[in-house]
Amino acid sequence: MRKLSLLVLLFACFTFAADKPASPELSKQGYEQFKSLQGDWIGTSTKGWKEEIRFNVIAAGSAVEERSFDAHPGETMLTIVHLDGERLMLTHYCAAKNQPRLLATTISPDGKTFEFTFLDATNLPSRDKGHMDKAVYRFIDENHFTTKWTWYENGQEKWLEEIQMERMPVKAAK
């Protein structure tokens, strides 16, 4: 009986530790980093496709909208990054017709790498149905960053791809 209790306790510790949000200070600093992305970007995937992305700071500065125009043929996808109190979160509005919410669980001390992990979702009857489960943003400089997205289905990570992003030059007004 003691062994079973110990196993349950250890499992609970590891389960809850994985869902712990990043520190409030790093989350707030990180949100400012996402706000700095405002503008147009071009991305190249490790699978060879290209996409255009537009970042906008919206809702009186309370959210950052990431609009992907070409990641999925004929579909625009949307990701919203925001603070929920002291937690940094994102919601991904996917062509898979679900909306996973991911929590920033790890932010590097230098504030350049953000790992978001699955928290919950709408329109996802079971976690085993296909959805975006993890996202990692790595900021290189003010004009370059990468993202890695992980697809999860039937209890397994199905694929991971990285997208190299580069800020597009600002077009002069005519």
Regions found by a protein language model. Give the residues of each.
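Hydrophobic small-molecule pocket/channel-lining residues, especially in calycin-type beta-barrels
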Residues: 19-174
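Sec-dependent N-terminal signal peptides
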Residues: 4-13
